[in-house]
């Protein structure tokens, strides 16, 4: 592997409030994420999940409360975290190798390291290509390699697979999981996709209107498939919460 990442960062979120104007976006969020854990945050659009991620990244200032990493308050940009977005945000005027090298600050033997990272994400030999010739999934592979380049202890994923087709999305889920299992960074994923959350996460946090309304452990063996025993039950539990359906009645019966 290109880089040896240390064990992931532990995150504590303590009574986090965020207000934009008169709108309360986060309302007393309390959560603990253990080092090396993979946690997914799910919720409807506008529930506050991406705002929460930005606070962990140090890109927002809380109205009150705080986020701590390994016991220290995060003030300013979190230097031990890297973000992946739905848009790969590659530099169109630089080739693929240099885009990955940005994560290495283009120092030392960055070209060798960047090439090794591209191999890790399944793009061996594509370093001289321009971003314009890559598919959406390939661009996200480059973005993942760039995110891993600095050896982050925390990988923040803001719906990075949301714009991909179903097959490419599955391939990327498998890649993210494989690299997480190897490097054991802490991963925090924001997604609308409940199936994706069950596929990847050790634990799922459900947010509604800026509050945590459910936390669900996912103890299924890895690698996971949607047809595995227990997968559909966990998915249905989360969907029932999001849709406001009483848990004692199966979702399919509720919708008939």
UniProtKB/Swiss-Prot annotation:
Enzyme Commission designation: 7.6.2.14
Compartments (UniProt record): Cell membrane
Keyword NADP: no
UniProt-annotated binding residues for ATP: 43-50
Broad class of enzyme this protein falls into: translocase
CDD domains, A to Z: ABC_NrtD_SsuB_transporters (cd03293)
Function: Part of the ABC transporter complex SsuABC involved in aliphatic sulfonates import. Responsible for energy coupling to the transport system.
Entry keyword NADP: no
InterPro entries referenced in this protein's UniProt entry, alphabetically: AAA+_ATPase (IPR003593), ABC_transporter-like_ATP-bd (IPR003439), ABC_transporter-like_CS (IPR017871), ABC_transporter_ATP-bind (IPR050166), P-loop_NTPase (IPR027417)
Catalytic reaction annotation: ATP + H2O + aliphatic sulfonate-[sulfonate-binding protein]Side 1 = ADP + phosphate + aliphatic sulfonateSide 2 + [sulfonate-binding protein]Side 1
One Pfam family recorded for the sequence: ABC_tran
Oligomeric and partner information: The complex is composed of two ATP-binding proteins (SsuB), two transmembrane proteins (SsuC) and a solute-binding protein (SsuA).
Chief location bin: membrane
Membrane topology designation: Peripheral membrane protein
Protein name per the record: Aliphatic sulfonates import ATP-binding protein SsuB 2
Domain ABC transporter: 11-234
Family: Belongs to the ABC transporter superfamily. Aliphatic sulfonates importer (TC 3.A.1.17.2) family.
Domain of life: Bacteria
């Amino acid at each position: 592997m290109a880089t040896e990442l240390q064990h992931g960062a532990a995150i504590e979120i303590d009574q986090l409030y965020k207000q934009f104007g008169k709108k309360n976006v986060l309302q007393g969020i309390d959560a603990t994420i253990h080092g090396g854990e993979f946690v997914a945050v799910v919720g409807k659009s506008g529930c506050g999940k991406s705002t929460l991620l930005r606070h962990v990244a140090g890109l927002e200032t809380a109205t009150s409360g705080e986020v701590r990493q390994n016991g220290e308050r995060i003030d300013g940009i979190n230097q031990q975290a890297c973000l992946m977005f739905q848009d790969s945000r590659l530099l169109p005027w630089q080739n693929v190798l240099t885009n990955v090298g940005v994560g290495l600050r283009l120092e030392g033997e960055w070209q060798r390291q960047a090439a090794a990272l591209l191999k890790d994400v399944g793009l061996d030999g594509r370093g001289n290509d321009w971003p314009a010739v890559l598919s959406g999934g390939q661009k996200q592979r480059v973005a993942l390699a760039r995110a891993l380049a600095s050896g982050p202890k925390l990988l923040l994923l803001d719906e990075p697979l949301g714009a991909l087709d179903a097959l490419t999305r599955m391939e990327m889920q498998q890649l993210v999981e494989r690299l997480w299992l190897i490097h054991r960074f802490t991963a925090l994923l924001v997604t609308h996709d409940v199936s994706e959350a069950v596929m990847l996460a050790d634990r799922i946090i459900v947010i509604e209107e800026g509050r945590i309304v459910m936390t669900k452990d996912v103890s299924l063996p890895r690698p996971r498939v949607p047809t595995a025993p227990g997968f559909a039950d966990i998915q249905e539990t989360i969907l029932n919460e999001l849709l406001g359906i009483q848990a004692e009645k199966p979702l399919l019966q509720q919708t008939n």
